[in-house]
């Protein structure tokens, strides 16, 4: 398949997923209206904050976490190969690439995109919040996990920044000694 044909194929599947998202969104709005007798007019700020944290956690779970790697790899071409390091130690490496084109390639791209998965996650969280009263417990649980995940991301960023400052200080000290 030529590269132009592959690009056209991917554009087609991207369009299909965009239309599908709009259909799901409109369908969800009609479903909410029929279940609740109308559309919600307001969300308490604390509930919106918890929904945002739940959306953040679902997004990280799908896009980044090791526990869902098996699902992401369903839509990827994975190859294992071994390599010998300079020390003679054998290392097994895994190469993960999207399939050439088609639906699986598009789904792979979607699963690698935190912004894309974030929109789908937000849609699911909001619909569940307004339609299913029991979902509040799940949203709360995901929000707590999201807060923990966010704290970990911030702690990692602070640690990396501190390490960079330490390395810069050591480099300046070395330069002064010369």
Predicted regions and their residues:
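Short, Lys/Arg-rich, polar N-terminal cytosolic tail immediately upstream
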Residues: 1-9
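Long, highly hydrophobic alpha-helical transmembrane signal-anchor segments
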Residues: 8-55, 128-130
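Hydrophobic alpha-helical membrane-embedded segments
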Residues: 45-71
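Alpha-helical transmembrane segments and their membrane-interface exit regions
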Residues: 55-57, 144-153
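Juxtamembrane/interfacial segments flanking transmembrane helices
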Residues: 63-75, 156-164
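Short membrane-interface loop/juxtamembrane segments of multi-pass integral membrane proteins
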Residues: 78-111
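Short, highly charged, low-complexity non-transmembrane loops/tails of multi-pass membrane proteins
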Residues: 79, 161-177
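Hydrophobic, membrane-inserted alpha-helices
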Residues: 119-129
């Amino acid at each position: 398949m030529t590269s132009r044909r592959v690009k056209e194929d991917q554009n087609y599947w991207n369009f299909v997923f965009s239309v599908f998202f709009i259909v799901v969104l409109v369908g969800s709005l009609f479903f909410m209206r029929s279940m609740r007798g109308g559309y919600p007019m307001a969300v308490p700020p604390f509930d919106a904050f918890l929904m945002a944290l739940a959306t953040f956690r679902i997004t990280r779970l799908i896009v980044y976490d090791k526990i869902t790697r098996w699902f992401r790899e369903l839509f990827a071409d994975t190859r294992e190969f071994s390599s010998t390091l300079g020390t003679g130690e054998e290392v097994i490496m895994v190469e993960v690439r999207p399939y050439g084109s088609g639906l699986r390639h598009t789904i792979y791209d979607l699963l690698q995109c935190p912004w894309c998965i974030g929109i789908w996650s937000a849609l699911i969280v909001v619909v569940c919040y307004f339609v299913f009263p029991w979902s509040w417990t799940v949203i709360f649980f995901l929000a707590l996990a999201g807060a923990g995940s966010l704290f970990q991301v911030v702690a990692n960023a602070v640690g990396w920044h501190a390490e960079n400052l330490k390395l810069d200080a050591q480099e300046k000290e070395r330069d002064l000694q010369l």
